[in-house]
A protein has these predicted regions:
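Pyridoxal 5′-phosphate
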Residues: 1-379
Length: 379
């Protein structure tokens, strides 16, 4: 089997991830709910995960990191906690439904939303950000990298635009956290949402968000916090402000271990390997007859994703053939990002997405490219 569906979830985790989770299950209590060793051990696990993520993302402190069940919950927390009826939000057609559906709900409640479009290659039309600005514009939310095309958003441009006009910038880093260097302070990001089970190498059921110090938002969920139990309102200090109830401590043990492994290897080195594998695959298939590749490959700095179609062949059928005949795991369909498919004309066909990890080998990539070329030749 060749696993090239890493944009959905990374399959191969470092051994330390499972070991950390097993240790938690055998020795940890409930963090913040006592003073005995098992609960203190759990608290140390949670803090370790915060600390490693703060280091990876160059956050001001571990307290800037709040945990959720996934990036979808993190994005809901940010958007629903910051946007009010009458506010205007600027976003893009590249977004995942984890951004779109919260915005649609907020629109039903009185918010307004504008969508920056893409050109025929899938690249954002950055001039439209200024075009869509209104007196009531409050927030900009963008994906760091499209989960469909792999194209990166120019965060330096978007951040400068947001800062110029006093807007809050929320970034969906589902495809980039752990896969490339990110410095939230240098980028001027106000909120950065991440998932644990992709490039951060943690287990499913983990995620969270970085929140810039001084930025406050209404919590999505309130309840048990382990502190200030006689107060009628949920605690307002970070990270407790955005965390209600018992955290997924086994998952956070694995996430902390995964991020620590990334830091030990160097995120720059891992990113360079993924970039090289992606470029190798692209160069081997770019001239295959009838193969249409989506996204811009003029620049090598992009997410490790190559999405394509074989002529008019249904993407789901092509993915089935890749699995059944070649043992290659890929993702086909709309990838939960409907607007980019509308923009690129692939609503009915979908796309076949290959996504790479530093865990993949050059031999695997070459075999996958060979399979693509064979299928293309067969027509």
């Amino acid at each position: 089997m060749i696993y090239l569906d890493n944009a959905a979830t990374t399959l191969q985790k470092p051994p330390c991830v499972g070991q950390a989770m097993l240790d938690e299950l055998e020795h940890a209590g409930n963090p913040g709910r006592g003073a005995h060793e098992p609960t203190l051990h759990a608290a140390r696990i949670v803090y370790h995960a915060r600390e490693t993520l703060a280091t990876l993302l160059h956050a001001e402190s571990p307290d800037c990191i709040a945990f959720t069940a996934n990036v979808t919950q993190a994005l809901n927390t940010a958007l629903c906690g910051l946007v009010r009826p009458g506010d205007h939000v600027i976003t893009t057609v590249c977004e995942h439904n984890s951004v779109l559906r919260p915005l649609y709900r907020l629109r039903e409640q009185g918010a307004e939303v504008s969508f920056v479009e893409v050109d025929d290659t899938g690249r954002l039309r950055y001039e439209q950000f200024e075009k869509f600005l209104r007196p009531n514009t409050r927030l900009v939310v963008v994906t760091h990298a499209s989960n469909v095309t792999g194209d990166l958003t120019d965060l330096a441009f978007v951040s400068a635009f947001a800062k110029k006009h006093g807007l809050t910038l929320v970034v969906d880093a589902a495809q980039t956290a752990g896969a490339r260097p990110i410095d939230v302070q240098a980028l001027g990001v106000d909120v950065l949402c991440f998932t644990g089970h992709k490039a951060l190498l943690g287990p499913q059921g983990t995620g969270g968000l970085y929140v810039r110090p001084g930025l406050t938002m209404a919590p999505l969920v309130v309840g048990g916090s382990g502190i200030h139990s006689f107060d009628e309102t949920h605690p307002s200090q970070m990270p407790t402000a955005l965390e209600a109830g018992t955290l997924n401590v086994p998952g956070l043990a694995g996430l902390g271990a995964g991020v620590e492994w990334i830091l030990s290897q160097g995120v720059e080195a891992l990113h360079e390997k993924e970039t090289a594998l992606t470029r190798l695959f692209y160069e081997k298939i770019v001239h295959a007859p009838g193969v249409k590749i989506y996204g811009s490959f003029d620049e090598t700095d992009r997410a490790p994703i190559v999405s394509l179609n074989f002529g008019d062949e249904d993407a789901a059928r092509a993915a089935d053939i890749l699995w059944e005949d070649y043992g290659i795991c890929v993702r086909a369909g709309a990838h939960c990002a409907p607007l980019i498919h509308k923009a690129l004309g692939t609503v009915e066909q979908g796309m076949v997405r290959f996504s790479f990890s530093h865990q993949n080998t050059e031999a695997e990539v070459l075999k996958a490219a060979e399979a693509v070329c064979e299928l293309a030749e067969e027509g």
